[in-house]
From Swiss-Prot:
The lineage of its organism: Eukaryota, Metazoa, Chordata, Craniata, Vertebrata. This is Phosphatidylserine decarboxylase proenzyme, mitochondrial. Coiled coil: none annotated. The gene is PISD. One of its GO terms (biological process) is mitochondrial protein catabolic process. It comes from Pongo abelii. Belongs to the phosphatidylserine decarboxylase family. PSD-B subfamily. Eukaryotic type I sub-subfamily.
Length: 409
């Protein structure tokens, strides 16, 4: 009887003649009981040839399938991350160095495809919007609480004084808040955290321990526009040697990360003369320590402004590196500099010389003098030559404030 019922059900679905008159009452009861569980399924009704047929759409099942897939993928990734953290903790207990895990080419390309420059320009315009007087205190208080801003150091502590976020980010400090150390030859140009420092051994400079960037890619090629006497470099070592202009000197570097809650202005780290500016339009990826450990040559990918010149021991450079929502880099004495502009294309650079017929020396800067500002947190990189007995007085990861000593002879 089950076979007979099955055939007649198939006939029903294919539009065979009325079935109630041809089925035995026992068969009708059996069919009704067999179809009872199907009534609980999500059926949809539609009309075909004037007959209403109930059928479960295939799309419903398709929509349900990604849910367990996403759950399994997310759970697997979370488990993998927990395993990595456990492994790092065990290596730390054993006193072993944790090797950095670098992003692959496709991961970097995917990150660079995000329109961070456009988003940063939008953020910059939002920062210029004047806030209502009643809204300023709650907005700024939230920012202060989130990033640990010390408003007692601000020249103006009244939050209602700052008309927009941009003014708040660029707030000035009280004169006594950052005393400049006069005993050391190089001071910190900004508040921040020391990511790395030391002597440049070869053409690869460490942005953080174990992760490097190319010295020539970062500073750009030496050209005649910089008014330097030596020819273009033909190799990595020759490029480094060109930066060291005096016999017996070595090349040094220091990387300082500015967090969003830090004082956003930067100052001259020593007495020197700025002769040249090179602007690299580029991406605006995050430069926080985690990203610096993940992306090789991160500083070479990002937009940056390289200031080069001379101090009493030879070559000296300060580079302001942009980041997400930090497309605006301002140099106070350079009115022609416009960063994160749509007319600038990635992969190029723009040179400007401060040495002219009327000014053969460039722009003299005194130690501690205001030099420029970011619109939010970012990174400062110092690369300079000094005698071999130059010593940094730093520890990797330490917090530092503008005016404190970096190193001396």
């Amino acid at each position: 009887m089950a076979t007979s019922v099955g055939h007649r059900c198939l006939g029903l679905l294919h539009g065979v003649a009325p079935w109630r008159s041809s089925l035995h009452p026992c068969e009708i009861t059996a069919l009704s009981q067999s179809l009872q569980p199907l009534r609980k399924l999500p059926f949809r009704a539609f009309r075909t040839d004037a007959r209403k047929i109930h059928t479960a759409p295939a799309r419903t099942m398709f929509l349900l399938r990604p849910v367990p897939i996403l759950l399994a993928t997310g759970g697997g990734y979370a488990g993998y991350r927990q395993y990595e953290k456990y492994r790092e903790r065990e290596l730390e207990k054993l006193g072993l160095e944790i090797p950095p895990k670098l992003a692959g080419h496709w991961e970097v390309a995917l990150y660079k495809s995000v329109p961070t420059r456009l988003l940063s320009r939008a953020w910059g315009r939002l920062n210029q919007v004047e806030l209502p007087h009643w809204l300023r205190r709650p907005v700024y208080s939230l920012y202060i609480w989130t990033f640990g801003v010390n408003m007692k150091e601000a020249a103006v502590e009244d939050l209602h004084h700052y008309r927009n976020l941009s003014e708040f980010f660029r707030r000035k400090l009280k004169p006594q808040a950052r005393p400049v150390c006069g005993l050391h030859s190089v001071i910190s140009p900004s508040d921040g955290r020391i990511l790395n420092f030391g002597q440049v051994k070869n053409c690869e400079v460490e942005q953080v321990k174990g992760v490097t960037y190319s010295l020539e890619s970062f500073l750009g090629p030496r050209t005649c526009t910089e008014d330097l006497p030596f020819p273009p470099a033909t190799s990595c070592d020759s490029f480094k040697n060109q930066l060291v202009t005096r016999e017996g000197n070595e090349l040094y570097h220091c990387v300082i990360y500015l967090a969003p809650g830090d004082y956003h202005c930067f100052h001259s780290p020593t007495d020197w003369t700025v002769s040249h500016r090179r602007h690299f339009p580029g991406s605006l990826m995050s430069v926080n320590p985690g990203m610096a450990r993940w992306i090789k040559e991160l500083f070479c990918h990002n937009e940056r402004v390289v200031l080069t010149g001379d101090w009493k021991h030879g070559f000296f450079s300060l580079t302001a590196v942009g980041a997400t929502n930090v497309g605006s880099i301002r140099i106070y004495f350079d009115q022609d500099l416009h960063t994160n502009s749509p007319r600038h294309s990635k992969g190029s650079y723009n040179d400007f010389s401060f040495v002219t017929h009327t000014n053969r020396e460039g722009v003299p800067m005194r130690k501690g003098e205001h030099l420029g500002e970011f619109n939010l947190g970012s990174t400062i990189v110092l690369i300079f030559e000094a005698p071999k007995d130059f010593n940094f007085q730093l520890k990797t990861g330490q917090k530092i404030r503008f005016g404190e000593a970096l190193g001396s002879l």
